[in-house]
């Protein structure tokens, strides 16, 4: 009977776990719907402001704005990595971290050796990972996703711009997971500073941009700027940077909720399978115990008859 109790305890424990994972799946699904609404609204605006900035950049001299080229004295680099504050979301965090580490190994190995590589980690998981490995961390953006707002994007950009203007780093790259659907997230390495020559497009932006990149006649728009391109550029560039980071934060948040929903759904399904297997094992063990008891009773009855 002790074996039966052990099996019963395991079934009860897994049943409790299943209830938790099912609840977490439902919470993630609700958060995902809200995150999707935000990212679907942000993408067109971020694309258009990028298009306009790129158009202005081509119209003007490369020296028209300090963010169009790296400071001459700058030798360092800043990598902004966006992860989650929590786990239980499959490979979401490890995908972003591995992408950042691959970027460092392939592009910034010498920079890291010279101790000129800096990391700005948005999310507890990435911050903890790179802090343990003694990277030079900039800022503190742990726990921002519970109340994610535009101020976070502005502060990240201000930290990145400050080091860029001071010549501490001459490149800023943004690493994050882009939301495609609940199953698929694209790992993105996006150049932020200096503003790239060609407009950067993620796989999802490439797909969605076909609907609004050009007018119906297929020709690029020739803008007329008022009060003038240089004046407009001073206003537009900060907004461009803010919205690229804001979009990346929203993409990552939506991808996180989608990954967590799928992970918790898989965990719930696995728990149900385990419960079925253990229930079958429990019934077999119980049947064996009953059979043994019946055999003991039968043997005892036969022994009494023989002795009588």
Swiss-Prot record:
GO molecular function terms attached to this record: ATP binding; proton-transporting ATP synthase activity, rotational mechanism
Chief localization class?
membrane
Question: What is the membrane topology listed in the Swiss-Prot or TrEMBL record?
Answer: Peripheral membrane protein
Q: Which UniProt keywords apply?
A: ATP synthesis, Cell inner membrane, Cell membrane, CF(1), Hydrogen ion transport, Ion transport, Membrane, Transport
GO terms of biological process kind: proton motive force-driven plasma membrane ATP synthesis
Q: Where in the cell is it found?
A: Cell inner membrane
Q: Name one GO cellular component term.
A: proton-transporting ATP synthase complex
Q: Does the keyword Cell inner membrane apply?
A: yes
Superkingdom is Bacteria
Q: What Pfam family does this protein match (any one)?
A: ATP-synt
- What PROSITE patterns does the entry give? ATPASE_GAMMA
Subunit and interaction comment: F-type ATPases have 2 components, CF(1) - the catalytic core - and CF(0) - the membrane proton channel. CF(1) has five subunits: alpha(3), beta(3), gamma(1), delta(1), epsilon(1). CF(0) has three main subunits: a, b and c.
Q: What does this protein do?
A: Produces ATP from ADP in the presence of a proton gradient across the membrane. The gamma chain is believed to be important in regulating ATPase activity and the flow of protons through the CF(0) complex.
> What family name appears in the similarity comment?
Belongs to the ATPase gamma chain family.
Task: List, alphabetically, the NCBIfam families matched.
Answer: ATPsyn_F1gamma (TIGR01146)
What PANTHER family does this protein's entry cite? ATP SYNTHASE GAMMA CHAIN, ATP SYNTHASE SUBUNIT GAMMA, MITOCHONDRIAL
Name this polypeptide is given: ATP synthase gamma chain
């Amino acid at each position: 009977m002790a074996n039966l109790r052990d099996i019963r305890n395991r079934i009860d424990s897994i049943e409790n776990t299943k209830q938790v994972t099912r609840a977490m799946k439902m919470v993630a699904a609700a958060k995902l719907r809200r995150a999707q609404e935000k990212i679907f609204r942000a993408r067109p605006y971020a694309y258009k402001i990028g298009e306009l900035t790129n158009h202005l950049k081509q119209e003007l001299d490369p020296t028209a704005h300090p963010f169009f080229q790296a400071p001459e004295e700058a030798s360092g680099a800043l990598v902004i990595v966006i992860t989650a504050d929590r786990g239980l979301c499959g490979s979401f965090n490890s995908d972003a971290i591995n992408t950042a580490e691959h970027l460092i190994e392939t592009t910034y190995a010498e920079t890291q050796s010279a101790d000129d590589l800096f990391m700005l980690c948005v999310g507890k998981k990435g911050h903890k990972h790179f802090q343990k490995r003694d990277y030079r961390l900039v800022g503190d953006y742990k726990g921002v996703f519970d109340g994610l707002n535009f101020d976070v994007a502005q502060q990240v950009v201000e930290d990145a711009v400050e080091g860029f203007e001071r010549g501490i780093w001459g490149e800023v790259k943004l690493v994050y997971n882009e939301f495609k659907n609940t199953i698929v997230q694209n790992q993105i390495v996006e150049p932020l500073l200096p503003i790239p020559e060609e407009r950067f497009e993620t796989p999802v932006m490439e797909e969605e941009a076909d609907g609004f990149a050009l007018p119906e006649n297929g020709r690029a728009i020739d803008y007329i700027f008022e009060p003038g391109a240089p004046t407009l550029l001073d206003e537009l560039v900060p907004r461009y940077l803010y919205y690229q980071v804001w979009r990346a934060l929203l993409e990552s948040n939506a991808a996180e909720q989608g990954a967590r929903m799928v992970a918790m759904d898989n965990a719930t399904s696995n728990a149900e399978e385990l419960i079925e297997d253990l229930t079958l094992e429990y019934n077999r063990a119980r049947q064996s115990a009953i059979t043994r008891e019946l055999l003991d009773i039968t043997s005892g009855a036969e022994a009494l008859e023989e002795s009588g």
